[in-house]
């Protein structure tokens, strides 16, 4: 009798679980507002012209390189500023637009809106780029040459397309007599690639000093429109970053005894440190799946996946351990679910026949938003479990927690809708950005921070980011300009129900 009762109970439990799984699988579909697609035949479509391309090429040819904190090419930053002012005369002469130069090189535009009761928003980009080694490129990285409809140059992706896209859109709108209802800001920092402490940080302080207490949302660079990156999904996936990983660089140091290699000690400084490094690499931090933006991303994308994957991704509460194991097998997906660890430097010894007196290694962690810097330090210390290995913090930054991405969150939905107006077959989803941006310098005036680049990427293109042969297609440049046009016009409304229609008068 007891056995029968147990069987009945098990069947009942399994039946309930099955019902819950199926209900979530077929009802967990994210909001998708109806939007009017942006078409080249529309009267307000911004067509790419030779003049637009030349302006973009010239911006790319200016070597606004940042090398390290405080070390950036000041003359080139001034040259780029001059180029922007010559290229966009309406932006720089309109009574609706006020430009302030911040910290000598960063640019803050204030655009007046007629309805001061509407909360302003902020569009950001950065003027600087990372260095490039010309010998490794197919084309010189600062000539902006065109081949097969692609423009090759450092900054084509990161992030002069943002600067030029925003200003091209605003120049076009002003030429059509656009008078915004909602006030907004545009900010271009000059040292984002070296943490933004001289540029965006000062811009953020300036906005706060003006008494700005709140932004409706902030849009900066970030994730992109991805093709073929997510197995099982055929259509493009546009990921909107709602959070950023933090980072922690730890120095591991061992002090040993010097001596001659003919009379070796039982353990040398290098040997002790090597064992510590092996322990770190052999013991990855635990999966944080379900505690950060990755959960929202997978649930948003589940409805685009084949049925089996859809069932699993819609029910992470049940299948989370399985997904964590699968994701742990490959570096790109492993980085989504946990704090990752990289041993980046190892130094020890001065001569082949001399025992090293000390050894040093550097560990870089990219921290999941669900964990703190101190947690990671404590974890490493416990795993190493050797008092001879001294840990010290070289640099760190806390992770940025997730911004709201619900059905009624204005900023997220404006960005999502604008994306789908340009890339009509794309699906959008919130996600976690692995790198860091200038957005942290504005976190005191808004929590609605989003990170998205209007860049189309195919498998392999991710290596061009900060890498060799960075490029953007002319078609993608046109899409980027029209994306920012839609951001400005859509955000000008006072609610999500009033998305800009192409027939609307500006």
Regions found by a protein language model. Name each.
Residues 1-14:
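N-terminal Sec-pathway targeting helices
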Residues 11-154, 175-182, 363:
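Acidic/His- and Gly-rich active-site-bordering loop/insert found
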Residues 7, 47, 98-102, 116, ...:
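An extended, acidic, His-containing surface patch that forms the Zn2+-binding/catalytic region
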Residues 150-151, 157-239:
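Acidic/histidine-rich catalytic neighborhood of metal-dependent amide-processing enzymes
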Residues 222-223, 234-249, 452-462, 466:
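Flexible glycine/proline-rich, aromatic-decorated loop/lid segments
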Residues 104, 139, 181, 214, ...:
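Short, solvent-exposed loop/turn segments at the edges of secondary structure
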Residues 201-205, 257, 262-286:
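A short core secondary-structure module
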